[in-house]
Amino acid sequence: YLLPVRTRVPLKFGAETLTSVTCARVQLCVEDADGNRATGWGETPLSVQWVWPNTLSYSDRYETLTDFCYRLAKAWSEFDGVGHPLEIGYDFIEQSLGDLLEEVNGERPSDAQMPWLAALTCCSAFDLALHDAYGFMRPTIDRT
């Protein structure tokens, strides 16, 4: 989901001022070795000005970030990680995130490359959802 949010006050990042932001909200389903399933949610602001400071137009950077989130959704749905969320998240970053970023940057001019920080920020919503889902499978968390 892409959720528009207006800020209470303007936030300045270098030469750009942020008055609204789009939050990427994701849902991730996980399954443990016993076949138990849980769903988790994660959200992060796609703060274009902060994650990708550049003279490129806001719309170009914004569209690239949102497209990258959709690519991440596909990649996470196909990722076959096993273990604790810290291990799975680390493995995804090491095995998939860099390749996805290279793919996106391969489609862009050399002076318009999406930075690693932007890729990590987009991925953070999925990492949060992974931890949330894992938490639902742990008996120490009472969500009632």
Question: Predicted segments — roles?
Answer:
Residues 141-144:
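Flexible, glycine/charged-enriched surface loops at secondary-structure junctions
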Residues 38-137:
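Metal- or metallocofactor-binding catalytic centers and their adjacent structured scaffolds
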Residues 3, 31-33, 45-49:
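Generic structural motif
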Residues 22-32, 42-44:
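Short beta-strand elements
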Residues 1-27:
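Short, Gly/Pro- and small/polar-rich lid/capping loops
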